[in-house]
Every structure is written in C-alpha cells, then in structure tokens.
Amino acid sequence: MKQIWQALKAHQQAVEHRGILDLFTDPRRAETFSTRLGDMLFDWSKTNIDHTARDLLIDLAGAAGVAEKREAMFSGEKINETEGRAVLHTALRNMDRPVQVDGVDVTPALRETHARMQAFVRDLRSGRFTGQGGPITDVVNIGIGGSDLGPAMACLALAPYADGPRCHFVSNVDGAHIHDTLQDLDPATTLVIVASKTFTTIETMTNAETAKRWMATRVSDPAAQFAAVSTAADRTAAFGIDASRVFGFEDWVGGRYSMWGPIGLALMIAIGPEAFDAFLAGGAEMDRHFREAPFAENLPVLLALVGLWHNQICGHATRAVLPYDQRLARLPAYLQQLEMESNGKRVAMDGHELTHHSGPIVWGEPGTNGQHAFYQLIHQGSRIVPCEFLVAREGHEPDLAHQHLLLVSNCLAQSEALLRGRSVEEARAVLAKKGLTGSELERQARHRVFPGNRPSTVLAYEKLTPATLGRIVALYEHRVFVEGVILGINSYDQWGVELGKELALALQPMLEGRAGTEGKDGSTAQLVAYLRS
C-alpha cells in the first residue's frame, strides 16, 4: 500500500496546477467519470482525478483489502475489533438473507421485531391504540446522537409521505428543547418514544423524566403513553413501560447506523410500514450494488475514493455536503455524525497512531441558502473546499415546478462556477460594460476574479422517495466503511465521546455547590465559580 500512496502523491503533485476544465477536452470525460445505479447518477468528472489517479485509487482499495473486509462485514464477522462486535446494520434491511453471529442466524429475531413494530404502528395509525384523551396526534422521540439524527433527518426528508401523527424530536439536555417541543402538544394524545439502548443515557433519561412529569399533568397513567427502544428490559419496566411497547436491537447495530430498525420507529409511525419497507428496500439495493459491482463501477467505493483523494492526497481538510433539496436540510448534520464519529480517529486498528490524517470535517447546508452565506469562501477563499451536491430531477410540488427548475439551475450553476471560475480578463469585460475604466476598473476586477478549478461532485436522482433516501443513506454508510478500511481505522467505535461524559458527572456537584474545585485547572475553576447555581 505504501507504494500506491506514494504514487498517488507523486501524481497529484505533477498535476495539481492542471485545470480540471482541461480534462474535458476528452469528449467522453463526463461519461467516463460518472456512475449510475437505477435512476441515480453520480458525476465525479469535475475533479482533478484522471485515468491514472483513478486506477491508482482502485488499486489502493484492492491492496487495503476492501473486498475481503466487505464480505467479513456482511458475513457477521467481528470487524469492530475494539469492542469485539460484528457490524450488521445491513441485516436490518436484508432480513430475508440468513446471517450468523456466533453461530446463530440473527434474521428470525430481526423479522420478529420488525413485525412487532409494524403491528404497533398499524394499531396506532388506525386508532386501535389511543392516548388517554383520544387517538394519538403527536409522537415525541427522545434520544440523542444516533437515536435522533437519523430518524429526524429521514422524517423531514420524507415529509410528503408523512400521513401519520406528527413527529417531533428532542435530543438536547438543555431544558429549552423539550419545553419548546411540548408546550403546544396535548399530553392526552401524545406518544413519547424513549430511544436509548441502555436506558441510561443521561440526556435522554433526563428528558424522559421531564416528559413523564408533563404527561402526568393530564393523564392518570403517564407510562401507558410511552414506548421504548432499548435492550434494558428491567429499566424500561421500572419506568413503567409495558413490554409490548419495548423494541430492542443488538449490540452489533451501532447507534449511528441504527435507523433501519427500532430506532426508526418514529419514522415508521410518520410514513407507515409500507413506505418504511420501501426505505429498507432502497438500502438493500445499495447493499447489493456495493457487494456485486466492480470497484470501477461501484458507487460507494468511488465516492470513498474521491473523498480520500481530496482529503489524503490533496490535503483538503473539509468537505461540504450541499443538498439542493430543502427536505434534506438535516442530511449534513446526519453525515457529520456518520462520518466524523466513525472516521475521526487518531489511532489505527493496530493500536498505533496514524501516520496520516483521519477523516475530514463534514459540514453543509441546503441550497440555495448556502449561496447567500458561505459560498463566498468556497468560490474565492484561500482554501479549497471540495463540494458534494445532491439534487433531484423532480420535486413533490407539481404546481411549483418552475421553482424546482430554478433550484436545479442554481445547483448546476454552482458546480460549473467552481469548475470554470472567472478570469481577470472576463472580469474586466464585465466591468467595462458597466462603464468602469482605468485604475478603478483594474482595482475592481481583482475582486471579481474567481479562481475556479475547485472540485465538486453531483449526486442526481429522480425524486426523493423512501427508496431513494434508503439508497442515499446506505451509499454514505458504505463510503464510511471503505474510507475506514483504507485508512486502517475502526469506523464502528466512538471512544472520543466518553471523556467529556465522565468530566461532566464530576462537575455537576461542583456547579451545585456541593463540592469544591480542587484539582481543576484555573480556567475551569473560574467558570464553575461564575456559573455555579
């Protein structure tokens, strides 16, 4: 692998001043550096990856053992080595294919849980399961991290399919979040879902207790309108939640990969079991493509290799995810956790510190909003930010098709502008038409130069349906896997979240005035004194 890394770096240094636009002298450039899956088109031709770089990157994936580790993951081997666990979120959307963990086929239990979820959701949506004041009108999902970001993102993304109760999401331990969410709801017609595998997550359980007290202001049996997504049956029972409304999932499903199963309960309630199954089917379709397509035609592999080229070879520390689809507004935040919690590591699988950078910083906002915020830096800033655009050919509002056309034209224009830029000669010509001359024209022209030659990709799809969203989410999940394998990282643990939790527990009695700040650094002690209740 070392030789391939070195060859990639040498090639990048040889071509880094080449214009990406120059690559389009090849009339087949766009076709050759694009990949399709059904109605999905991934165009990565507006990057500085040429045939040589592409071939080297594919060789890198082969040398890293991506194919072998891919099969190990799908087969239930314990590829999460630091925790001794399999990584089988894919089984949640492929329940008809037997998978063994420790010699036991896990799919019958998955099918049973899925059927229980469907039955509960159908009862709730039909009115057979009611609140103590009538049919359920609102559902509040209380969870954090993977118990929140995925289903919250998906519920917004699939709003046109949401014909069930209104779904709300509470994650932050800040009391303002649950207060603002509950204040306009009726406890007598609200279901609360507490999503915590261990039923001990401090933010989630604090909010759950608050919701229970709120529920008690209107109903005689608050726990009767609670459901739980948890494996801690003793704790859910102690909370008062009937076992029929408790849905568990195994430790081989990581939190940020879990919305395909019981963590997606709120999503299933919102869009119904049939649409939820279409979401699963979309993910399963991407799984099959990932397992079967050769690397040169494999969307997750190519998306990962493009990301590695930009981050590891070109040295671009961030990437912007820019969905030109307002209902994907929460996708960048979801991908922040998926990618940064998975591949934001400094230690390799073998326990040694990495000799290269780990994954990039992921951020973004939907278009066209971002154009009026941070695109200035993307176009004219001194650092290059690779951009990943997403756009649908068709919207859900036929009477507003003219607005969708404007949205799409803006997406394509931004991608083209990053590629082409604007030269000083072109800037002078524009200003001359406005009547500027002489030194003022020259001064202004320099501010209107766009360097261009900035890489971007476009993921285009027909329409944001449940199946399409499933394909998109699974695509990014597998991208994380491929990048992690090549970087030598365990993408499925998250020890970086632990230290802050431990310190917060120790700080709480200090802030309450029950303990002193001995042993704390001067800054922390000063802040405790200022913020002490």
Swiss-Prot record:
The keyword Transcription regulation does not apply. It is found in: Cytoplasm. Keywords: Cytoplasm, Gluconeogenesis, Glycolysis, Isomerase. GO terms for cellular component: cytosol. Pathway: Carbohydrate biosynthesis; gluconeogenesis; Carbohydrate degradation; glycolysis; D-glyceraldehyde 3-phosphate and glycerone phosphate from D-glucose: step 2/4. InterPro entries: G6P_Isomerase, G6P_Isomerase_C, Phosphoglucose_isomerase_CS, SIS_dom_sf, SIS_PGI_1, SIS_PGI_2. Its EC number is 5.3.1.9. GO terms for biological process: gluconeogenesis; glucose 6-phosphate metabolic process; glycolytic process. Transmembrane segments: none annotated. It comes from the Bacteria. The active site is at E341, H372, K501. One of its GO terms (molecular function) is monosaccharide binding. It catalyses: alpha-D-glucose 6-phosphate = beta-D-fructose 6-phosphate. PANTHER family: GLUCOSE-6-PHOSPHATE ISOMERASE. Catalyzes the reversible isomerization of glucose-6-phosphate to fructose-6-phosphate. Belongs to the GPI family. This is Glucose-6-phosphate isomerase.
